[in-house]
Amino acid sequence: MEMKEFIEYFADQFDDTPVDTLTPETVFHDLDEYSSIVALSIIAMIDEEYGVTLTGNEMKAAVTIQDLFNTVQAKLA
């Protein structure tokens, strides 16, 4: 799993947030478009693309895209 690919999949969950504005350090909860529906879309994307099930608490605990990436990587190990 690579960060660039993860960010591309992550960006696909948003309608108006371009992928080039997202970095590993992006605090995704602060994005204008972020909502509970987007959070569910991200959880579903991670399950579909990586076969990893995230809980709501894990989504809440992740502050940045890097945090989310690290959580997924840990579950893949």
Regions found by a protein language model. Name each.
Residues 1-43, 48-77:
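Phosphopantetheine-dependent thiolation modules in NRPS/PKS and related acyl-activating systems
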